[in-house]
UniProtKB/Swiss-Prot annotation:
GO terms for cellular component: plasma membrane. The gene is srrB. It comes from Staphylococcus aureus (strain N315). This is Sensor protein SrrB. The modification Phosphohistidine is found at residue 369. GO terms for biological process: osmosensory signaling via phosphorelay pathway. The chain crosses the membrane at residues 12-32, 175-195. Residues 33-174 are extracellular. It holds the Pfam family HisK_sensor. It is a multi-pass membrane protein. The lineage of its organism: Bacteria, Bacillati, Bacillota, Bacilli, Bacillales.
Length: 583
């Protein structure tokens, strides 16, 4: 109900109705008052004219009694006539009740003395009670010299008339006026409602448009064809709505681009306002904040506070959960509406870079060690032979055998480095052929039979000799050689190395399993990384470059397959190779 009363249509309609009603009431009151006054005055003037004529008639008549009777015949109905010579000595015996009361009014009302003493006409309204009801009369006294009077200068002609006819006329006029006013008010009400609806229709459209704009809908643009102020307002509002839509679209596009850029960043990004609340973040930052510990959180808060104080960019290193981060905090003058400042925090995960740098350092150290050892042996044994320290044929033969072994070791190390360099520069190529897998495994069996016996290992090959695979013999030989060498390095006498094959609907599967020392869980995700090496303390004494498993992964992936590892520390390791079946 209140919302309807607050409507512009209702307010305008009620205003028009109130104004028209007020005007009609005032006009009706003025008209009724005027008509009452008019008819009263007309009646009074008519009575006065009658009194004047009677006065003249009686004064000019020789037979005054006949003239009075004649006048009474004319006036008595519906009014009354009295000619009073002396109001103080007037007999009431032959008068009617109304005339008696009229005579009493003349006698007792001092205003009528002016009729007898000054010769003035006097008019008064007199209320007469008769038969339990009251009736109002107009009583007029008119001076005359028709009869001689020793007590006063004038006699009086008094005519009274019932005002009921005037009241009836006034009532009829009042009813007609009220009915006319009601009809006019009804017509005005309908017209005012139509007019107010017509006038406010563009305003209601503008209201609907403003509501839709506030809700983000800029498509509704009502057309107002009027050339008045409302039409101009509508055109201006449509123009404003179009410009707002363009600005909002531009802001939305910018925001979407910004959000996409922020979410696509590998760094975690946080926006912090003056209240130290996060107002902006991307997925990476959310993941980091979900896993942050108390020490790292305190470190981050200290850096943020330092940035607020210094208003300078701060860059610090953070280590958390065995990962390494670089935290950069930058002061921003305006980060929120109202010109409030804040800090943008960028958290970059440098774990891979840190590990790569560490692996490079380890690689340089390992390669230096690997190169120094065979070179030192080569130099020592050759110097012994050249200097004649070793002269016996058997000793010379043993020294040359050591030189040969170390040369092979040095050659293998250099070949691994050259292979990786070649693969980085030229890529890796494989020549797959459909051939029995048994050919490769038989080759491995012959190759490592003596080594297994020397190391005291149980090496078994369980495979289906009739099964054919699609693979490059030389590349797969390189893979298995690397994997079996690794297995031999991480086992001790009595352990077992088993090579078995299997299949599923789309892949051929090869398992290389050992019961050696195994690999710790924190190393499993990095064993295939370039230059990565597991703790050398668990190896048999041979060092490597950390490139073997990296090369194996590249070869298998070039075949269109995959290589995975499962290991449990202290129980052994299993490498799983999956190659697509021949078409």
């Amino acid at each position: 109900m209140m919302s309807r009363l607050n409507s512009v249509v209702i307010k305008l309609w009620l205003t028009i109705i109130l104004i028209v009603t007020t005007v009609l009431i005032l006009l009706s009151i003025a008209l009724i008052t005027f008509m009452q006054y008019y008819f009263t005055q007309e009646t009074e003037n008519a009575i006065r004219e009658d009194a004047r004529r009677i006065s003249s008639l009686v004064e000019q008549s020789h037979n005054k009694e006949e003239a009075i009777k004649y006048s009474q015949t004319l006036i008595e109905n519906p009014g009354g006539l009295m000619i009073i010579n002396n109001k103080h000595r007037q007999s009431t015996a032959s008068l009617s009740n109304i005339k008696k009361q009229m005579l009493n009014e003349v006698v007792n009302n001092d205003h009528f003395d002016d009729v007898f003493d000054k010769g003035k006409s006097v008019t008064r309204n007199v209320t007469i009670k008769e038969k339990g009801s009251s009736q109002t009369y107009i009583l007029l006294g008119y001076p005359t010299k028709a009869q001689k009077n020793s007590h006063s200068k004038y006699s009086g002609v008094f005519i009274y008339k019932d005002l009921k006819s005037i009241e009836d006329t006034n009532n009829a006029i009042t009813i007609i006026t009220i009915i006319t006013a009601v009809i006019f008010l009804t017509i005005t009400t309908v017209f005012a409602f139509f007019l107010s609806s017509r006038i406010t229709k563009p305003l209601r459209r503008l209201r609907d448009q403003a509501t839709r704009v506030s809700e983000g809908d800029y498509s509704y643009k009502p057309s107002v064809t009027t050339k008045d102020e409302i039409g101009q307002l509508s055109q201006a509002f449509n123009q404003m709505s179009t410009e707002i839509e363009e600005h909002v679209d531009a802001l939305s596009t910018s925001k979407n681009i910004r959000d996409s850029l922020i979410n696509s960043m590998v760094e975690g990004v946080l926006g912090i306002n003056e209240s130290r609340q996060i107002i902006l973040s991307n997925k990476m930052a959310n993941d980091i904040m979900d896993n942050i510990d108390e020490d790292a959180k305190a470190f981050l808060l200290r850096q943020i506070e330092d940035t607020f104080k210094s208003k300078q960019t701060e860059m610090r290193d953070l280590e958390m959960n065995a990962r390494f981060f670089v935290v950069t905090t930058s002061y921003i003058d305006k980060i929120e509406q109202g010109g409030k400042s804040g800090v943008v925090v960028t958290v970059r995960d440098m774990t891979n870079e840190h590990n790569l740098d560490q692996m490079k350092k380890d690689f340089i150290a390992n390669v230096s060690h690997e190169l120094r050892t065979p070179i030192s042996l080569l130099q020592g044994y050759t110097e012994s032979i050249v200097d004649g320290i070793v002269t016996e044929p058997d000793e010379i033969k043993e020294s040359l055998a050591v030189v040969l072994d170390e040369s092979k070791r040095l050659n293998r190390l250099v070949n691994e480095l050259l292979n990786v360099a070649r693969m980085d520069a030229e890529g890796l190529s494989v020549n797959k052929e459909v051939q029995p897998i048994a050919a490769l495994l038989d080759k491995m069996k012959i190759k490592y039979r003596q080594q297994a016996d020397d190391l005291g290992l149980n090496m078994t090959f369980n495979y289906c000799k009739k099964r054919v695979w699609s693979y490059d013999m030389d590349r797969m030989d390189q893979v298995l050689t690397n994997l079996i060498d690794n297995a031999s390095r991480y086992t001790k006498p009595g352990d077992e190395i088993a090579i078995t094959c299997d299949e599923n609907e789309s892949e051929d599967i090869l398992y290389i399993k050992d019961t050696g020392t195994g690999i710790a869980p924190e190393h499993l995700q990095q064993v295939f990384d370039r230059f990565y090496k597991v703790d050398a303390a668990r190896t048999r004494g041979k060092q490597g470059t950390g490139l073997g498993l990296f090369i194996c992964k590249m070869i298998i992936e070039e075949h269109g397959g995959s290589i995975d590892v499962k290991s449990e520390l202290g129980k052994g390791t299993t490498f799983i190779i999956k190659l697509p079946k021949p078409e």
